[in-house]
Each structure stands twice: as C-alpha cells, then as structure tokens.
Amino acid sequence: MPEFQERVRNFFKESKRVFLVTKKPGWEEYKKAAKITGLGILVIGLVGMLIRIIGILMLGG
C-alpha cells in the first residue's frame, strides 16, 4: 500500500509541474485550433460519405 501512495504522490507532483509550465491559450490560438478541428471533422465526414456512396454504388443497396 505505501508503494501505491508514493506513486499517487509522484503523479500529483509531476502534474503540478506540468500545470506550472503550461499557459492558457490566447483568443487567436483558440480560433486557430477551432478552425483546424472543424476542418478535420469535415474531412473525416466527407471521407465517410464517399465510402458510403461507393459502397452503395458497388453493392447496389
């Protein structure tokens, strides 16, 4: 049991270090990330739709 407690303590210590180094993104960075995410969702949706259309055309159903 002490080993588990030590692992949990180390995890929180490392997590605290990460939070101290990171920073909150600015508005421009947020907009860029949102655009890239939206574009990725759109591309994945289009690929799925194309696969579905090809399947319908090949299998007739």
UniProtKB/Swiss-Prot annotation:
<dbReference type="InterPro" id="IPR001901">
    <property type="entry name" value="Translocase_SecE/Sec61-g"/>
</dbReference>
<keyword id="KW-0811">Translocation</keyword>
<comment type="subunit">
    <text>Component of the Sec protein translocase complex. Heterotrimer consisting of SecY (alpha), SecG (beta) and SecE (gamma) subunits. The heterotrimers can form oligomers, although 1 heterotrimer is thought to be able to translocate proteins. Interacts with the ribosome. May interact with SecDF, and other proteins may be involved.</text>
</comment>
<dbReference type="Pfam" id="PF00584">
    <property type="entry name" value="SecE"/>
</dbReference>
<dbReference type="InterPro" id="IPR008158">
    <property type="entry name" value="Translocase_Sec61-g"/>
</dbReference>
<keyword id="KW-0813">Transport</keyword>
<keyword id="KW-1133">Transmembrane helix</keyword>
<dbReference type="InterPro" id="IPR023391">
    <property type="entry name" value="Prot_translocase_SecE_dom_sf"/>
</dbReference>
<dbReference type="GO" id="GO:0009306">
    <property type="term" value="P:protein secretion"/>
</dbReference>
<dbReference type="GO" id="GO:0006605">
    <property type="term" value="P:protein targeting"/>
</dbReference>
<keyword id="KW-1003">Cell membrane</keyword>
<dbReference type="GO" id="GO:0065002">
    <property type="term" value="P:intracellular protein transmembrane transport"/>
</dbReference>
<dbReference type="GO" id="GO:0008320">
    <property type="term" value="F:protein transmembrane transporter activity"/>
</dbReference>
<comment type="function">
    <text>Essential subunit of the Sec protein translocation channel SecYEG. Clamps together the 2 halves of SecY. May contact the channel plug during translocation.</text>
</comment>
<dbReference type="GO" id="GO:0005886">
    <property type="term" value="C:plasma membrane"/>
</dbReference>
<feature type="transmembrane region" description="Helical">
    <location>
        <begin position="39"/>
        <end position="59"/>
    </location>
</feature>
<keyword id="KW-0472">Membrane</keyword>
<keyword id="KW-0653">Protein transport</keyword>
<comment type="similarity">
    <text>Belongs to the SecE/SEC61-gamma family.</text>
</comment>
<keyword id="KW-0812">Transmembrane</keyword>
<protein>
    <recommendedName>
        <fullName>Protein translocase subunit SecE</fullName>
    </recommendedName>
</protein>
